[in-house]
């Protein structure tokens, strides 16, 4: 329960409110709840996939999951629309956002802490096909994929790069100078047909 008591007549705007626990699994800053992470640990998973599902694509590419927005101080991470915010017209959630409170740095730490191989999932230049079907305007043309390819390369460097590299240094500055030993990378989520295949 969060309780904020204010006195006076001026208005107050709260920019960032977090109810993340302080007492986290392995005492990680901005880490997972102890009970949830312990349950994951007790299952001995071989692989931990993140992020899951259609959130990778977003309902449009503007709202796709972008890993670079999920690192750095939590209070500086931007909000993003959630893929499920307006998918079903009978079930609108206009205030349902992603906070990126759990980002890729915390994800890599969690995988390490529970002994699982991380399997990050990155966008392949396609918005959610279920929502956009085969509308080519909802997807990046194949000859314009370079920024998406670079995001994949940068994530690999963030996870495994030496501390003298741009993204390896960022990882070290966040408190983890040793590489995370990333071995796997998924590109795209639940896509199909030639729109997807031509991007591989």
Task: Cite the ranges covered by each PLM segment.
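Non-catalytic accessory regions flanking glycosidase/transglycosidase catalytic cores in CAZymes
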Residues: 1-200
């Amino acid at each position: 329960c969060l309780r904020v008591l204010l006195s006076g007549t001026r208005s107050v705007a709260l920019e960032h409110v977090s109810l993340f626990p302080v007492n986290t699994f392995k005492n990680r800053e901005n880490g997972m709840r102890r009970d949830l992470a312990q349950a994951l640990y007790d299952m001995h998973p071989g692989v931990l996939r993140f992020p899951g599902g259609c959130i990778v694509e977003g309902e449009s590419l503007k709202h796709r999951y972008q890993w670079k927005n999920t690192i750095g101080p939590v209070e500086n991470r931007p909000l993003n629309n959630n893929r499920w915010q307006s998918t079903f017209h009978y079930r609108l959630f206009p205030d349902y956002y992603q906070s990126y409170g759990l980002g890729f740095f915390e994800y890599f730490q969690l995988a390490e802490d529970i002994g699982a191989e991380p399997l990050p999932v990155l966008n392949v230049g396609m918005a959610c096909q279920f929502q956009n079907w085969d509308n080519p305007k909802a997807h990046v043309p194949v000859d314009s994929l370079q920024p998406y390819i670079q995001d994949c390369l940068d994530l690999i460097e963030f996870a495994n790069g030496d501390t003298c590299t741009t993204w390896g240094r960022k990882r070290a500055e966040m408190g983890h100078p040793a590489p995370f030993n990333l071995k796997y990378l998924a590109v795209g989520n639940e896509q199909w047909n030639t729109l997807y295949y031509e991007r591989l």
